[in-house]
Design a protein with these regions (language model features):
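N-terminal Rossmann-like FAD-binding beta1-loop-alpha1 element of flavoenzymes
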Residues: 5-30
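Residue-level detector of alpha-helix initiation sites
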Residues: 7, 11-12, 262, 415, ...
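Glycine-rich loop(s) and the adjacent beta-strand/alpha-helix scaffold that form part
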Residues: 23, 34-39, 43-44, 195, ...
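Redox-cofactor-proximal catalytic regions of oxidoreductases
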Residues: 49-132
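A glycine-rich dinucleotide-binding beta-alpha-beta segment and adjacent secondary-structure elements
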Residues: 61, 186-189, 227, 382, ...
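FAD cofactor-binding and catalytic pocket of flavoenzymes
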Residues: 68, 83, 87, 93, ...
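Conserved redox-cofactor binding core of oxidoreductases
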Residues: 109-219, 449-452
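An active-site-proximal "capping" alpha-helix that borders the catalytic cofactor pocket
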Residues: 114, 428-429, 502-508
């Protein structure tokens, strides 16, 4: 069978493309390397590593993918529904700095262009403001007052059925959509919602798309793409099979790649430099890769329970360029605590910060031991998600090697991405004093000066020319017909807030 379009990836961009194409009557196949989930399939805690983490090489087929490079650490989602399965439901419209970024402002007034599509995305994702102030939110509000930024403190907008009851109903689509239950506020959003309250993509865009004829092929990885005889040829292999990689080839007239910024760049760089099967892709593929100018730090060991409500419930801006949210895991989901150590101030070299951490651990042994033996870390800890609109970027490159090659992130340019954001550190320390908790930094940031992000963006610059961009202003790939990219890789700048709503609106 020859499809009208094949979509690779079922995250926000891929789900939008799939629904809007089948609505127009096209025959569409969606290829997703991850698994399909029902609410009861999700793990009860993130200690259930085979169900939580995506590491196919050791037969872990969860939905949380952790990618470690020498210059950056990246968290992303895998499965039918992509990042929506693991994200913290937070749906924000960015500040004006993003829309005015020089990387794309010459193509139009993006705030005005995207306004109706933000409305459409908000409707589909069920965007609604969380209204409660829990203990941890009130502490963040106190910090905002201390930093003369109380006017920026607010509750967040989320895509969760926060007003529902235990009885199943369709709160979003007037009875046309799937049934849901109400949120029980367990903070389990990032471990997979077992309550069927989270408005994930398989419950909105993909649900309707399948009703209209979309074919979804899960547990299948797109490995090679070629274009000849006016058709795209997609060579795939099974990801989860016990009996080797079952290979299949699919053909289509058009192609949408939306495998997430990381997945899209790996797939396309491989086609250009490993297989030479898409040789006309732009030479700037992989450039302008961004982390959303993001860092993560934490406070743990507080005397009170700090993981109430949803995974993210409140936010404030300590300065005009910075957006800080508190992030929580549910009870008994302590696996992520091992990524954190005692906090160390200063944007020094990794050697200097590592030495400071060693000295602090030796001179404050009780503090160190409290973090190690804190078996209720997810209950008494909050993580600070610090995001900025500051314009910095890295570059993703493909390195051919004896074993097939690999991706590498180059963070040496003029717009080097920092691993340490001083204003975020200050928020963390002020918060720690108020809850008598212990400030913590991510160890990889301290030891290797390596930024960590849950929101990798960019890598496919926008331009009128193939020499300076991968896509045009309509997200069409230069050099090939009916080939589009609709995920985070086409976001042209650091958003400074959670990017899911923007990726959805841009795809719309």
């Amino acid at each position: 069978m020859i499809y009208d379009y094949i979509v690779i990836g079922s995250g926000f961009g891929g789900s939008v493309a799939s629904l809007r194409l089948v609505e127009k009557g096209y025959k569409v196949l969606l290829i997703e390397q991850g698994k399909r989930y029902k609410p009861e399939d999700f793990p009860k805690s993130n200690w259930n590593i085979p169900k939580y983490l995506w590491v196919p090489s050791i037969r872990c087929f969860g939905f949380q993918k952790l990618s470690f490079y020498s210059t950056a650490s990246i968290m992303s989602g895998t499965g039918v529904g992509g990042g929506s399965l693991v994200y913290a439901n937070t749906l924000y419209i960015p500040p004006d700095e993003f829309f005015n970024n020089q990387s794309w402002n010459r193509f139009g007034d993006w705030k005005k262009i995207l306004e109706p599509y933000y409305d459409r995305a908000s409707f589909m994702l069920g965007r609604k403001k969380y209204s409660k102030l829990n203990i941890e939110d009130k502490v963040l509000e106190d910090v905002s007052k201390d930093m003369d930024a109380h006017n920026t403190f607010d509750s967040v907008f989320v895509g969760v059925n926060i007003d529902g009851s235990e009885d199943e109903s369709d709160p979003y689509f007037g009875g046309l959509g799937p049934l849901r239950k109400g949120c029980i506020e367990c903070a389990g959003c990032m471990v997979g919602c077992r309550e069927n309250a989270k408005n994930t993509l398989d419950r909105n865009y993909l649900w309707f798309a399948e009703k209209m004829g979309l074919e979804i092929l899960p547990e299948t990885k797109a490995e090679k793409i070629s274009y000849h005889n006016n058709l795209y040829h997609i060579e795939t292999e099974s990801v989860t099979s016990f009996f080797g990689n079952r290979k299949r080839i699919f053909e289509s007239k058009g192609l949408i790649v939306a495998a997430g910024a990381l997945g899209t760049l790996e797939l396309l760089l491989k086609q250009k430099y490993k297989y030479s099967s898409l040789p006309f892709l732009s030479p700037v593929l992989g450039h302008e890769l961004r982390t959303n100018a993001e860092t993560l730090c934490a406070v743990s060991g507080g005397a009170e329970k700090l993981n109430n409500g949803l995974a993210i419930t409140s936010v404030f801006s300590p300065d005009p360029f910075t957006h800080v949210e508190i992030v929580k895991y549910p009870d008994k989901s302590n696996a992520m605590k091992w990524f954190f150590g005692l906090s160390v101030r200063g944007a020094d070299s990794s050697i200097s910060r590592s030495w400071k951490l060693f000295v602090k651990s030796i001179t404050h042994p009780l503090l160190f031991l409290k973090t190690v033996f804190n078996f209720n870390w997810s209950t008494n800890a909050v993580i600070f998600l610090v995001m900025q609109t500051t314009d910095n970027a890295m570059k993703m490159v493909w390195i051919n090697g004896l074993f097939g090659g690999k991706m590498k992130i180059d963070n040496r340019g003029n717009k080097k991405v920092p691993a340490y954001i001083a204003i975020g550190q200050e928020v963390m320390e002020r918060y720690a004093r108020k809850v008598t908790g212990i400030p913590q930094n991510i160890l990889l940031e301290v030891f290797f000066n390596r930024p960590t992000t849950a929101h990798i963006l960019g890598g496919c610059p926008m331009s009128d020319s193939i020499d300076t961009g991968v896509v045009d202003k309509n997200l069409k790939v230069h050099g090939y017909p009916d080939f589009y990219i609709t995920d985070g890789s086409v976001i042209q700048g650091n958003i400074g807030v959670n990017p899911s709503l923007t990726i959805t609106a841009v795809a719309e």
